[in-house]
């Protein structure tokens, strides 16, 4: 019962002006559009990336966990240790309508080797982050089967730096995967 109360608070949670998304697709696209001027150079503008070591922006990355873990992340300002080498994130958007939550759990369990993702209630919530230059793109990908039988591939990213800055948190909310 206490967890239900805590999860209802999750939807009212506001972290550094970031509120829960009731329409993740619209909010993710808006967030991406808001960030474009920050990461794309203006025409004829020179950029000196050598000083930064060639920082790469991977776009929005998503973390899928249960409500209690998500609340702890926000409270502590750190990512959960959900992988043997730190935190694992993906570019699978939480509004992917042709993938079921069970299939996402299967893909995460396979990618992470983490038994907790066998329970579909482990990933109904997402947090979207923007980590330019702070994550490593892994060689392997998460392979999912769509509701139409099509093979879909999503990139996986790792972060050993688990603390996050408030401005790296873009959105959070409940996933809108296909029901199946």
Curated annotation (Swiss-Prot):
Pfam families: RolB_RolC. GO terms for molecular function: beta-glucosidase activity. Its EC number is 3.2.1.-. Keywords: Cytokinin biosynthesis, Glycosidase, Hydrolase. GO terms for biological process: carbohydrate metabolic process; cytokinin biosynthetic process. It is an enzyme of class 3 (hydrolase). It comes from the Eukaryota. Hydrolyzes cytokinin glucosides thus liberating free cytokinins. This is Cytokinin-beta-glucosidase 2. It comes from Linaria vulgaris. The lineage of its organism: Eukaryota, Viridiplantae, Streptophyta, Embryophyta, Tracheophyta.
């Amino acid at each position: 019962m206490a967890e239900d109360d805590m999860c209802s608070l999750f939807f009212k949670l506001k972290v550094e002006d970031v509120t829960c998304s009731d329409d993740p697709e619209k909010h993710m696209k808006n967030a991406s559009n808001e960030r474009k001027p920050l990461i794309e150079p203006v025409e004829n503008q020179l950029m000196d990336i050598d000083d930064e070591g060639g920082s790469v922006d991977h776009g929005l990355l998503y973390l899928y966990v249960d409500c209690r873990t998500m609340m702890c992340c926000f409270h502590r300002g750190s990512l959960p240790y959900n992988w043997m080498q730190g935190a694992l994130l993906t570019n699978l958007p939480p509004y992917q309508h042709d993938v079921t939550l069970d299939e996402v759990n299967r893909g995460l369990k396979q990618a992470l080797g983490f038994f907790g993702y066998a329970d579909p209630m482990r990933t109904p919530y997402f947090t979207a982050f923007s980590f330019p230059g702070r994550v490593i793109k892994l060689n392997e990908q998460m392979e999912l089967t769509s509701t139409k039988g099509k093979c879909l591939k999503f990139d996986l990213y790792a972060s050993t730096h688990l603390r996050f800055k408030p401005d790296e948190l873009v959105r959070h909310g409940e996933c809108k995967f296909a029901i199946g």
